[in-house]
Amino acid sequence: MLLQIAEPGQSAVPHQHKLAVGIDLGTTNSLVASVRSGEAKTLPDMKGNVILPSVVQYQEDKICVGMNAYQSAAMDPQNTIISVKRLMGRSLKDIQARYPELPYQFSESENGLPVIQTAQGEVNPIQVSSEILKSLSRRAQDTLGGELEGVVITVPAYFDDAQRAGTKDAATLAGLNVLRLLNEPTAAAIAYGLDSGQEGVIAVYDLGGGTFDISILRLSKGVFEVLATGGDSALGGDDFDHVLAQWIKEQAGITSPLSSQEQRELLTLATQTKVALSDSDNVKISFKDWSGEISVELFNSLIQPLIKKTLMACRRALKDADITSEEVMEVVMVGGSTRTPFVRTSVGDYFGQTPLTSIDPDQVVAIGAAIQADILVGNKPDSEMLLLDVIPLSLGIETMGGLVEKIIPRNTTIPVAKAQEFTTFKDGQTGMMVHVVQGEREMVEDGRSLARFSLKGIPPMAAGAAHIRVTYQVDADGLLSVTAMEKSTGVQSHIQVKPSYGLSDNEVANMLKDSMTYAKEDMKARALAEQQVEADRVIEGLVVALNNDGDALLSKEEQAEILQAIEALITLRQGTDAQAIEDGIKKADEASQEFAARRMDASIRAALAGQSIDEV
């Protein structure tokens, strides 16, 4: 008889290779990769294609995903969903404002999320994304010959909580076990870092079909640290197609609106022309009754404003990282749109070096995700690689006066947990509203509200006596949990922040820009609000003290002097001069100094009443 012997807690077959994959869930195309025989490779379909167009067509009796769906887009635009990643985590109003030309019939669900009317009924962006993930999962399981233990799915670094949560929901709907969501530029760094063993600062320029990300990373002794991120969640190669399509419309003299089918045909023509211009100086094109020619120089001039926007984001990211372009050792190009020669030369000129393109820019993200999945599933327990992502915008809490107290600053590495203690403002206060905000500005009204929740059951105490510990925790996927706990009783309240929809495009960049533009004004506004809050505290404290002990401890003249100081402070409090309010607070403190001393003496006498010196 043969017995299988294993260490306690270990598998009886500890060297069995667990099946895990990395998925690049892209706006235009998606890929799946896995580590096989020690090497990460993308997995092809039965026809040998590694790229799966991120297109889903809903027919009455079936759902098509990929190339078949893509080829049907022009004939059946309303039932063929392309670039669904652009819709993830957005409100219907935001989608209609940003993409008015989309051929879909939208409506709004009961919870305010957008749904698309198709031949199979209503579908939402999460369901559409899940169909793409199902297709990639089937491909992986057929190729690898078994059930998947887990997946790592990549997302743009600029995806907010709602967009990340939507991606995880899509994976769950597809029956996948998500090991981790991974920022796309970070996945590329893993692929290049492990392949070439570089150490130092690198810039990852990721221009896909629908998103742009720039990440400044430091690679050192196996540690991938993201120093800063930037980008635009709605800028990519699709926009190249749109500006070229608009040019063709103008050249053809088309002024009346196009049908859905004609619009799709025009965009398909624009895409084909863009690709052809990567290898040719001139391309002949025709649309409807018009024929013409476009040169690569003209095409470059059309897309130059879009490329300039990406380079401005690069400049901001370098500034955030406190790095100069000269300190960047390598520039990694990621995303199919970086195949455009003018993109490569523009980025090369900006950074003063030839960008790295040795790994297929379409496949590099999936390859990096596969390497990470292989580690997380336990196939490389001895791996020393450490991965540190960052949050793109500061997370804070509203305090008295509409001020923002930042708990976790932007560009903090995640996962992270930070706590801060707060107290009550009024005597006998038994509840507290916790307002979670996002952004770089000093005042709540200038930031983005994420969530509100209440902490109830605080024991009645004097103002400032209660201790409420508020903990912000961001997990590896960038999702935020907030807990508030009153320390003496242990009573607590908790919320996981999952906004109903995400930031509109350019909003993150604008929030960062505004924080610099209005820095001086914000600090003045904060200083004023802080003095107003302090004035309120002093006024309320003195009024309560006078009501309780004024007659017993003060003469009428002394009471009148303090009341005069209070009234003067109330008047100053209503103004906008922070220094004047601060001076008024000092005068009120000086006027009440003797009163405070007498109250302290009276309290001590009351506490010691009836006790002997020995007992004291």
UniProtKB/Swiss-Prot annotation:
<protein>
    <recommendedName>
        <fullName>Chaperone protein HscA homolog</fullName>
    </recommendedName>
</protein>
<dbReference type="InterPro" id="IPR013126">
    <property type="entry name" value="Hsp_70_fam"/>
</dbReference>
<dbReference type="InterPro" id="IPR029048">
    <property type="entry name" value="HSP70_C_sf"/>
</dbReference>
<dbReference type="InterPro" id="IPR010236">
    <property type="entry name" value="ISC_FeS_clus_asmbl_HscA"/>
</dbReference>
<dbReference type="InterPro" id="IPR042039">
    <property type="entry name" value="HscA_NBD"/>
</dbReference>
<dbReference type="InterPro" id="IPR029047">
    <property type="entry name" value="HSP70_peptide-bd_sf"/>
</dbReference>
<comment type="similarity">
    <text>Belongs to the heat shock protein 70 family.</text>
</comment>
<dbReference type="GO" id="GO:0016226">
    <property type="term" value="P:iron-sulfur cluster assembly"/>
</dbReference>
<dbReference type="GO" id="GO:0140662">
    <property type="term" value="F:ATP-dependent protein folding chaperone"/>
</dbReference>
<comment type="function">
    <text>Chaperone involved in the maturation of iron-sulfur cluster-containing proteins. Has a low intrinsic ATPase activity which is markedly stimulated by HscB.</text>
</comment>
<dbReference type="Pfam" id="PF00012">
    <property type="entry name" value="HSP70"/>
</dbReference>
<keyword id="KW-0547">Nucleotide-binding</keyword>
<keyword id="KW-0143">Chaperone</keyword>
<dbReference type="InterPro" id="IPR043129">
    <property type="entry name" value="ATPase_NBD"/>
</dbReference>
<dbReference type="GO" id="GO:0051082">
    <property type="term" value="F:unfolded protein binding"/>
</dbReference>
<dbReference type="GO" id="GO:0016887">
    <property type="term" value="F:ATP hydrolysis activity"/>
</dbReference>
<dbReference type="GO" id="GO:0005524">
    <property type="term" value="F:ATP binding"/>
</dbReference>
<dbReference type="InterPro" id="IPR018181">
    <property type="entry name" value="Heat_shock_70_CS"/>
</dbReference>
<keyword id="KW-0067">ATP-binding</keyword>
